[in-house]
Structures are given as C-alpha cells and as structure tokens.
Swiss-Prot record:
It is an enzyme of class 5 (isomerase). InterPro entries: Aldolase_TIM (IPR013785), PRAI_dom (IPR001240), RibuloseP-bd_barrel (IPR011060), TrpF_fam (IPR044643). Transmembrane segments: none annotated. One of its GO terms (molecular function) is phosphoribosylanthranilate isomerase activity. Its EC number is 5.3.1.24. Belongs to the TrpF family. Gene3D superfamilies: Aldolase class I. This is N-(5'-phosphoribosyl)anthranilate isomerase. GO terms for biological process: L-tryptophan biosynthetic process. It comes from Streptococcus pneumoniae serotype 2 (strain D39 / NCTC 7466). Pathway: Amino-acid biosynthesis; L-tryptophan biosynthesis; L-tryptophan from chorismate: step 3/5. Keywords: Amino-acid biosynthesis, Aromatic amino acid biosynthesis, Isomerase, Tryptophan biosynthesis. Coiled coil: none annotated.
C-alpha cells in the first residue's frame, strides 16, 4: 500500500484531520515559506501525532546543527532536505533522511546518502506537476516519494505510473492557500482505496 505524506501543516485542526484520515507522514516546513512553522510550534503540534505516524521536518540547504536541533526539539522521525546537501549531512543522524530532487528535464538522479529520495517539481510547493516522462526510477537504490502538483484527481495515475513508496502533497490539499480538511480526507482516501476503484 502506497504511503501518504501530508506536508505544510501548521494548525491543530489540520494535523488532527490528517492523522484521523490515515496519513502515514506529517510534514512541518521549517524553511521560509507561507507554510513555515517554528520549532516551538511544531513541537506543540507533534504532541497530537501518534507514534505510528511519522513526523518529517522540511529544510532548504540546512546545516547539520540546524537538523540536529530540530530533531531534538520536535522529536522528528525524518528530515527532508531541499537545495544544497553537504556530503556528510546525513551521516549518523539520529533519524532517517529524505533528499528532495527537482525533476527539471535532465533526468539526473543524484547519488545520495539519504534513506529516501523525493522527486518534486522544479518549483516546490507551486502546485505544478513535473513531466512524469522525464523521470526514470528504474534501479533506484532507495525507496522514493513522488511530489509536485499532486491532488485527488491525479494521484492514482501517479501511483500507477511510478509505483512509489509514498506520495507527498501540500498545495493539492489547500483552498485559497489554507489546508482544506475535506481535501485532505479525499486525497488520503483516494490513495488508500483508489487503485482498486479505477481498475
């Protein structure tokens, strides 16, 4: 069964909705963006998340010190890194790691030390999907997430195309820039039940 990550959550209600609907991963954005939360805010929201739902911190070009501080303060289960990744960034971290890769048409997949890869659109959080035909996941060493412009209407097709470990959504479950609780529920339901329903 494909796992689901709901990213960019910043309110108690959105976290509770995602958890009750069956999300496997909850993402907190620490990089500057309209979805950014502080470590203190994330730590409070993390108290609402049961142990079987994994907490992910999202960073852009962080230092190792930044990662370790967030892991400690929030109790993160994974760190997701966009942008520049130092060679030793993921070494001996006390949690798992995800390296984000922007699919920009050159088909290049980096040789990464991360535990997972996440394939995203050239502009993360834009709501625009990348050209799925530009990405060949054959022979990848790591399990991978598919992100970038996913929503309840295209996520089943994405799963059928890539057979990913997980799918990741943020703007695809928003209305007017805010997390939409019904869209969160429908997205997760589509992932968990949608494959059989479309065949």
């Amino acid at each position: 069964m494909t796992k689901v990550k709901i990213c960019g959550l910043s309110t108690k209600e959105a976290v509770e909705t995602a958890v009750s609907a069956g999300a496997d991963y909850i993402g907190f954005v620490f990089a500057p963006s309209k979805r950014q939360v502080t470590l203190e805010e994330a730590a409070e929201l993390a108290k609402l998340i049961p142990a079987d739902v994994k907490k992910v911190g999202v960073f852009v070009s962080p230092s190792r010190v930044e990662l370790l501080e967030a892991i400690d303060k929030v109790g993160l289960d994974l760190v997701q890194v966009h942008g520049q990744v130092a060679d030793d960034l993921f070494e001996n971290l006390p949690c798992a790691s995800i390296q984000a890769v922007q699919v920009d048409g050159n088909g290049h997949v980096p040789n990464s030390q991360a535990d997972y890869l996440l394939f995203d659109a050239p502009v993360a959080g834009s709501g625009q999907p990348f050209d799925w035909g530009q990405l060949d996941t054959t022979g990848l060493a790591q399990p991978f997430f598919i992100a970038g412009g996913l929503n309840e209407d295209n996520v089943v097709k994405a799963i059928q195309h890539f057979t990913p470990y997980a799918v990741d959504v943020s703007s695809g479950v928003e209305t007017d820039g805010q997390k939409d609780h019904e869209k969160i529920r429908r997205f997760i339901e589509r992932v968990k039940n949608g494959i059989s329903r479309t065949k």
